[in-house]
Amino acid sequence: MANSKSAKKRALQSEKRRQHNASRRSMLRSYVKKVIAAINTGDHKAATEAFNAAQPIVDRMATKGLIHKNKAARHKARLNAKIKALAA
């Protein structure tokens, strides 16, 4: 438990950030799941549109520090590879 005034403030800030980051992380996962769902249906056009919507979100979360930039690149590369496999 926080005893000093500054420790209490930091605890409040930490909780606020945790909730904000959880919301952002949930949004990121939702966008990625939409792409995966479109891929699983086999609809190339829908998968491409979902990927085009998800790509800037993934990049933004990496820029904000929510996920590592390499993880963002890995997500995009794997999803794009699956979409290209649909077209083939």
Swiss-Prot record:
GO terms for biological process: translation. InterPro entries: Ribosomal_bS20 (IPR002583), Ribosomal_bS20_sf (IPR036510). GO terms for molecular function: small ribosomal subunit rRNA binding; structural constituent of ribosome. Keywords: Ribonucleoprotein, Ribosomal protein, RNA-binding, rRNA-binding. Pfam families: Ribosomal_S20p. It comes from the Bacteria. The keyword RNA-binding applies. Disulfide bonds: none annotated. Residues 1-27 are annotated as: Disordered. GO terms for cellular component: cytosol; small ribosomal subunit. The keyword rRNA-binding applies. PANTHER family: 30S RIBOSOMAL PROTEIN S20 (PTHR33398), SMALL RIBOSOMAL SUBUNIT PROTEIN BS20C (PTHR33398:SF1). Belongs to the bacterial ribosomal protein bS20 family. Binds directly to 16S ribosomal RNA. This is Small ribosomal subunit protein bS20.
